[in-house]
């Protein structure tokens, strides 16, 4: 598996780090854009990458401003800058990959940015796997205990020097405002394909409230999946293989429909 990293400019000229993985010998049919969540960065999902590459994906993961290896103030420009950075990255991918299909896996904070991206760029008919979306309040702190249920997962997070233990108050307020606006007028999701995945013990996303909200969205055949005992990062938990398999299964099913 090949792994490279580089930088790309967002629409305002800020340099954002991204990395990508691919199997050049096996080849790939699709590109998965992985958008990190609260407390995380582009390298926070080590189990997801090989599973997607084995399924003939190229995986591209950016660091939002101030997170991971991206320089600058954490969350500079707010959710709007994140959404526009996703568009800039998609254009960069298209220039390199041509007609290969792009799909998005968006976690937590990244899910709010991805939904705003779809609203701002309605011509994009990209399918979206939404994981633990922060739609009902945004915390400032992101402790390992909030993200993880099992001890190994907690230790991996606490040992990560790029773990973002907190975000600025202004970013939290902006994310919260954006989430409320997205839920108040979800018409931009009319006919789109999205699936929602959440841990049943997530302290930040009440899954029953999320299920009710998803049921009101004008999506085409929405999917809602919960995972017992998982917290805010179900991708990295003990049942991460089942979570990732659920992503891949949904993408395959909806590709054919």
Where in this protein do the model-derived segments appear?
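Conserved alpha/beta-hydrolase
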Residues: 49-73
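N-terminal cap/lid segment of alpha/beta-hydrolase-fold proteins
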Residues: 1-23
């Amino acid at each position: 598996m090949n792994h490279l990293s580089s930088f790309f400019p967002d629409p305002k000229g800020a340099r954002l780090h991204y990395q990508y993985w691919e199997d050049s010998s096996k080849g790939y049919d699709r590109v998965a854009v992985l958008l990190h969540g609260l407390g995380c960065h582009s390298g926070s999902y080590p189990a997801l990458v090989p599973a997607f590459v084995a399924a003939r994906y190229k995986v591209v993961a950016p660091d939002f401003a101030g997170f991971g290896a991206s320089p600058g103030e954490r969350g500079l420009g707010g959710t709007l800058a994140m959404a526009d950075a996703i568009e800039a990255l998609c254009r960069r991918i298209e220039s390199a990959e041509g007609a290969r299909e792009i799909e998005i896996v968006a976690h937590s904070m990244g899910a709010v940015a991805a939904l705003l991206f779809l609203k701002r760029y309605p011509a994009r008919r990209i399918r979206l796997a939404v994981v633990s979306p922060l739609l009902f309040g945004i915390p400032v702190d992101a402790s390992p205990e909030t993200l993880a249920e099992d001890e190994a997962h907690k230790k991996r997070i606490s040992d990560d020097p790029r773990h973002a233990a907190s975000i600025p108050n202004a970013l939290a307020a902006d994310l919260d405002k954006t989430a409320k606006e997205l839920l108040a007028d979800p018409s931009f999701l009319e006919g789109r394909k999205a699936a929602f995945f959440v841990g049943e013990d997530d302290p930040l996303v009440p899954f029953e409230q999320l299920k009710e909200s998803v049921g009101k969205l004008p999506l085409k055949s929405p999917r809602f999946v919960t995972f017992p005992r998982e917290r805010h990062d179900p991708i990295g938990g003990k049942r991460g293989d089942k979570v990732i398999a659920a992503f891949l299964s949904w993408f395959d099913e909806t590709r054919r429909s």
